[in-house]
């Protein structure tokens, strides 16, 4: 995350970042407060719950999240930049002291979060993960600290792929090369459930949402296929043997058809008989 640290941990970083946000929402003709409320709603949190915000910047997403978790809820806001977290904490203490007790600010690396497993009800990130040294690890850490059933919402620059080869797409990528990046959907943990991929702000920012789960999708791989080939998902995946000639394959298919069975069942039977004969000979 050296790129993020170099960019945002300077005396002028807070003003530069706020200037960028003002430009961003003006450019896409979006009301920032309304937009952030809509993004926070994707977390599906309820009053009294605990939310983690990684890459919190100046804490601009916190008001919308606090509105959802209510006076008994908590927000833990993390950023790599000390300048950002100090400024954000100072603003909350000065402007909203009655709510500041609900917020914990910390400076640290989002790739190694200092939290136990499953301690949050949801996790949120907007506008920084593209610069992480390891995007997949950033996703994995949010997944780790959120309880099963909790929601993770992550968003950053990346124009929709259907726009990349248009004049619009070339214009926005020329303005900011990060908008040329792909949504890192392949970086999700294998256990991610209820996954949603979309785009916001002129389709120039991708949004990935998923529910934390403790297992990969459920299925029964042993249900037999009906028809000529037969077998199951499991046998087709794990039971492949050495290749045979096309002529031998045709002979097997014809033999299975004459026997009124699937190719899988015919092969299982033929191989079992052959192995039995071999074992008898060895005795």
Segments (PLM) and residue ranges:
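Short alpha-helix
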Residues: 175-192
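Short Lys/Arg-rich basic patches
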Residues: 220-247, 256, 265
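A short glycine-rich, Lys/Arg-flanked "PGG" loop and its adjoining helix->strand segment in the class I
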Residues: 136-148
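Conserved class I S-adenosyl-L-methionine
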Residues: 1-45, 60-64, 94-95, 151-176
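Short amphipathic alpha-helical segments
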Residues: 101, 241-244, 252, 256-272
């Amino acid at each position: 995350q050296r790129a993020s640290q170099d960019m945002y941990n300077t005396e002028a970083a807070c003003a530069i970042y706020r200037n960028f946000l003002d430009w961003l929402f003006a450019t896409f003709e979006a009301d920032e407060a309304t937009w952030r409320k809509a993004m926070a709603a994707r977390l599906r949190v309820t009053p009294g719950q605990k939310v983690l915000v990684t890459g919190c910047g100046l804490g601009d997403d916190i008001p919308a999240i606090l509105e959802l978790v209510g006076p008994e809820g908590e927000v833990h806001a993390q950023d790599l930049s000390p300048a950002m977290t100090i400024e954000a904490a100072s603003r909350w203490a000065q402007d909203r002291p009655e709510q500041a007790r609900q917020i914990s600010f910390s400076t640290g690396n989002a790739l190694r979060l200092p939290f136990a497993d499953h301690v949050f009800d949801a996790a949120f990130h907007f506008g920084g993960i593209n610069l992480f040294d390891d995007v997949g690890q950033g996703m994995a850490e949010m997944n780790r600290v959120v309880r099963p059933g909790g929601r993770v919402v992550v968003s950053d620059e990346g124009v929709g792929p259907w726009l990349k080869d248009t004049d619009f797409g070339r214009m926005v990528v020329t303005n900011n090369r990060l908008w040329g990046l792909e949504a890192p959907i392949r970086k999700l943990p294998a256990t991610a459930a209820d996954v949603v991929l979309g785009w916001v702000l002129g389709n120039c920012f991708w949004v990935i949402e998923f529910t934390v789960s403790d297992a990969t999708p459920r299925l029964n791989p042993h249900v037999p296929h009906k028809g000529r080939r037969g077998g199951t998902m499991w046998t087709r995946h794990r039971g492949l043997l050495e290749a045979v000639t096309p002529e031998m394959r045709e002979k097997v298919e014809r033999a299975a058809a004459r026997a009124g069975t699937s190719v899988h069942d015919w092969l299982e039977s033929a191989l079992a008989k052959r192995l039995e004969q071999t074992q008898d000979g060895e005795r």
